Amino acid sequence: MTDKKAGGEKLLYCSFCGKSQHEVRKLIAGPSVFICDECIELCNDIIRDEIAETVDAEGTRTTLPTPQEICEILNQYVIGQTQAKRNLSVAVYNHYKRLRHLSGRKEEVELSKSNILLIGPTGSGKTLLAQTLARLLNVPFVMADATTLTEAGYVGEDVENIIQKLLQKCDYDVDKAQHGIVYIDEIDKISRKSDNPSITRDVSGEGVQQALLKLIEGTVASIPPQGGRKHPNQDFIQIDTTNILFICGGAFDGLEKVIRNRTEKIGIGFGAEIKSREGKNVSESFRQVEPEDLIKFGLIPEFVGRLPVVATLQELDEEALIQILVEPKNALVKQYQKLFSMEGVDLEIRPAALHAVARKAIRRKTGARGLRSILESALLDIMYDLPTLEGVEKVVVDEGTIEEGAQPLLMYAEQPKVSGSN
């Protein structure tokens, strides 16, 4: 668009907003059209917003995976624990199916939430299962340690801090946070000290259970904005926890004794049947767990009632630990091989060495969690020296490297022969 000035010079205008060339910083000419810098900036903003919306739409699952699909994906990352994975797959599927069913309608039958309790030894995969589920469903996920929680007003973390972390994880998007997953680890550590109500204050045991009750069941939590501290005359962010899935996990050391006391009746007298209490391992005992055992262990009845889905995980044997080392997508052996390949070196860990790593983890009673530290200590020296070693083509780790601390075998590239003058 153009006009003629008094001196005959043409005055140019933006074809979109109508501003003259003197009102804008830059006017760009096209075939019979002009566009100013302000309109270009506005177009960029519109396109950027549309791209972001498209990415969000593609990133969010439009179809909910079936329990079988959930279980198959869990199999790629977690070895063994078949029954626990089936329990989790069904519980998570039903939870998110319930949320889709609830959206925007009022139904005659109200579907209640089924939170989950994972019981299993250290290093059996409780945390990994919860993390993998959240990644699969593309929902916000946060972990909390129950041992750091105290009742409101005491030194320690308030239970509402868990929801604050979840809100921070999804950039203060309230709607996303209200459909997230919270994993509370070490839940067995907040059991009350005895199964009888105490007259003394137990701010990190029964007190925390009482504080968690409403949060897990569903309440509106008031969260200070941007992670600040609560103070009067402050606007709070309201988060409804009704649709947040809570998964609690713990090792529950000593629970097997409670279960055996209930299941194995020891008779007295000459005609009594004598049963050995050593026949069952911890995993077999956990499979028989009942709500009354958890109450006897130290969880209050109301808290047990809010965790209706109980999944037990088994102790990992030597073969399962070896599978964990080599099979999953993010297997430890694959990770170390990748690190060595960045130095241009192949890493071979022989089968005998894998068995030695698994046996060591079993002796330490650390389960899968201890595998990395064993491999790290065995490979530390060679990883320290490798960047300065020349000609190394392959590093071989055998049983002696794991059990006795021997140095790995180094294989060098064959040097090319240079013909010398006679």
UniProtKB/Swiss-Prot annotation:
Residues annotated as transmembrane: none
Single Gene Ontology BP annotation: proteolysis involved in protein catabolic process
Disulfide bond annotation, renumbered to this chain? none
Q: Name one GO molecular function term.
A: zinc ion binding
* Coiled-coil regions listed in the entry: none
What keywords does the record list, in alphabetical order? ATP-binding, Chaperone, Metal-binding, Nucleotide-binding, Zinc
Give the residues the record marks as binding Zn(2+).
C14, C17, C36, C39
Cite the binding residues for ATP.
P121, T122, G123, S124, G125, K126, T127, L128
Gene Ontology CC annotation, any one: HslUV protease complex
Per the database record, which ranges form the ClpX-type ZB domain?
A: 2-55
InterPro entries under this entry? AAA+_ATPase (IPR003593), ATP-dep_Clp_protease_ClpX (IPR050052), ATPase_AAA_core (IPR003959), Clp_ATPase_C (IPR019489), Clp_protease_ATP-bd_su_ClpX (IPR004487), ClpX_bact (IPR046425), P-loop_NTPase (IPR027417), Znf_CppX_C4 (IPR010603)
* Free-text function comment from the UniProt entry: ATP-dependent specificity component of the Clp protease. It directs the protease to specific substrates. Can perform chaperone functions in the absence of ClpP.
Instruction: Relate the assembly described in the record.
Output: Component of the ClpX-ClpP complex. Forms a hexameric ring that, in the presence of ATP, binds to fourteen ClpP subunits assembled into a disk-like structure with a central cavity, resembling the structure of eukaryotic proteasomes.
Q: Say which family it is in.
A: Belongs to the ClpX chaperone family.
Task: Give the protein's recorded name.
Answer: ATP-dependent Clp protease ATP-binding subunit ClpX
**Originating species:** Aromatoleum aromaticum (strain DSM 19018 / LMG 30748 / EbN1)
